[in-house]
């Protein structure tokens, strides 16, 4: 996902946890009255404008009511783009309780009307008239204790169907979903169009873009080579690629650093990427995009999500095996896992049953995007021609379940290697109300005290997730969407349902 005005080189997937509407509706309170204070009046005005869904109104309200100190950081147009993104996820907020209220500050607990998602909304204003807004935050929180009823598996399936039907009815989701228990599907769902231009609906076997889920394939390939004794996690880039011209990277960055996003390397996107996008088909084509970039910090010091690092892992796989990266992954991962529809398809070819992405982001230059409400645009001219070691293969929900079953059944890696991949290596980010960590090619979360393991993906017209729940009945969830946020909305809701509500 993206910010309101965003450098493609700093695309960050913004994620929220969702809760089931039908489980909450009967137990929620009516809107709490907002206090008649300067802060309360500003919040009430903001809520009214937000619920209008009019982006021009967002801009006007922000320009007139936000303090100059905030507008100096981000313009009214930039901030309105962020509010537009939030609007698509929430539609409006229903105030459930007042947590704090003074003349200059108000904090409320609220639910998003579309999803039932809980937030803490905080607003501060200046001390004198006209009481402009000096701070506004929207923080995801866990549902209050007792606000959700427990579900049996049959009820879980009904809740999922009800929720996804509601999202599809307002065009918030397009794509496919599969839920499995013990590796066997218990629910499949399809909504939306694979091609709006040709009126082709999505099918359960439609191939959709995975974005960064593809990093798991690269990580598995590297761990296979470690098992074979062809690589060590402590090997430096220069040991494997002595010709790599960036000596800072070659001498200080190890395989461990690349896998865990702790190398200090950055992204591949930017003006260079935009200028060469139609010619990027092989791993070697990507190296000039970042080979001269300095490290942002000493390797191992902290985490910085790095697409460039995973491209470099692809180059290492090619050097060690003497094989094209794509051929290796097909032979050693896709084929043994039984994945019959997954590949790094070239999108300028007419591939049957391949979904087109649709986005609310509009290019405003080679390295900038702005988010706009209104009709989504197809991404035929935005995305790359072909996926690569950091992401972008196409697959189906059924194929990704096959991958999960093969990986967890130790057909691709040993139990020791899988445990190594799915053990916390570094703090990743604050994910909604919980912390998220990174292993080797896997995101590791602890949601409501239960482990969630997998990977998400996001790009223009792409949102995807593959996750399993080892402490919660051994469920696996695969969701693929050809909308910017559709897949994330669904996976976040299912995380909450499975870890908090399932009996």
Predicted regions and their residues:
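Short, conserved catalytic-motif segment at the N-terminal edge
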Residues: 152-210, 292
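Exposed beta-sheet edge and beta->alpha loop/turn motif
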Residues: 100-148
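Short active-site loop at a secondary-structure junction
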Residues: 67, 168-176, 198-257, 297-308, ...
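Short, low-complexity N-terminal intrinsically disordered segments enriched in polar/charged residues
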Residues: 27-56, 64, 143-158
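Short, surface-exposed loop or secondary-structure junction motifs
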Residues: 195, 248-453
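Short, Gly/Ser/Thr-enriched beta-strand-loop segments that form substrate-interacting elements
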Residues: 100, 110-113, 428-470, 478-481
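Short solvent-exposed beta->alpha transition segments
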Residues: 40, 52-104
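Bacterial N-terminal signal peptides
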Residues: 11-21
């Amino acid at each position: 996902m993206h910010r309101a005005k965003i450098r493609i080189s700093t695309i960050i997937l913004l994620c929220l946890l969702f809760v089931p509407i039908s489980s909450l509706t009967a137990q929620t309170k009516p809107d709490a009255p907002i206090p008649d204070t300067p802060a309360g009046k500003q919040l009430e005005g903001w809520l009214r404008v937000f619920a209008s869904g009019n982006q021009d109104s967002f801009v006007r309200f922000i320009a007139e009511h936000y303090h100059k100190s905030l507008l100096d950081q981000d313009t009214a147009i930039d901030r309105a783009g962020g509010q537009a993104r939030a609007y698509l996820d929430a539609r409006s907020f229903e105030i459930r309780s007042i947590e704090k209220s003074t003349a200059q500050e108000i904090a409320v607990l609220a639910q998003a009307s579309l999803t039932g998602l809980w937030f803490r909304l905080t607003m501060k204003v200046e001390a004198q008239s006209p009481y402009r807004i000096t701070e506004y935050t929207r923080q995801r929180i866990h549902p209050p204790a007792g606000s959700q009823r427990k579900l049996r598996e049959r009820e879980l399936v009904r809740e999922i169907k009800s929720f996804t039907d509601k999202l599809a009815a307002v065009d918030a989701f397009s794509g496919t979903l599969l839920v499995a228990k013990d590796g066997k599907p218990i629910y499949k769902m399809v909504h939306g169009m694979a091609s709006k231009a040709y009126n082709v609906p999505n099918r359960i076997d439609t191939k959709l873009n995975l974005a960064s889920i593809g990093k798991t394939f690269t990580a598995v390939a590297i761990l296979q080579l470690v098992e074979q004794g062809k690589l060590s996690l402590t090997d430096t880039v220069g040991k494997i690629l002595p010709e790599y011209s960036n000596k800072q990277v070659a001498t200080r960055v190890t395989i461990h650093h690349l896998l865990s996003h702790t190398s200090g390397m950055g992204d591949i996107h930017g003006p260079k990427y935009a200028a060469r996008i139609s010619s990027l088909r092989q791993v070697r084509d990507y190296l000039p995009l970042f080979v001269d970039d300095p490290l942002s910090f000493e390797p191992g010091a902290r985490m910085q999500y790095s697409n460039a690092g995973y491209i470099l892992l692809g180059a290492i796989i090619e050097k060690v095996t003497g094989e094209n990266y794509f051929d290796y992954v097909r032979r050693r991962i896709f084929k043994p896992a039984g994945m019959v529809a997954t590949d790094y398809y070239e999108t300028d070819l007419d591939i049957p049953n391949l979904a087109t992405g649709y986005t609310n982001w509009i290019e405003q230059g080679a390295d900038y995007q702005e988010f706009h409400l209104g009709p989504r645009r197809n991404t035929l001219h935005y995305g790359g021609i072909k996926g690569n070691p950091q992401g972008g293969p196409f697959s189906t929900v059924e194929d990704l379940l096959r991958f999960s079953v093969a990986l967890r059944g130790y057909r691709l890696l040993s139990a020791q290697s899988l445990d190594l991949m799915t053990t916390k290596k570094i703090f990743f980010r604050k994910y909604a109300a919980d912390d998220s960590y990174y292993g080797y090619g896997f995101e590791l979360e602890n949601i409501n005290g239960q482990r969630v393991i997998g990977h998400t993906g996001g790009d223009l017209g792409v949102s995807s997730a593959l996750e399993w729940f080892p402490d919660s009945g051994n469920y696996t969830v695969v969701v693929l969407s050809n909308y910017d946020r559709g897949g994330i909305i669904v996976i976040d809701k299912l995380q909450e349902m499975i870890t908090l509500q399932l009996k």
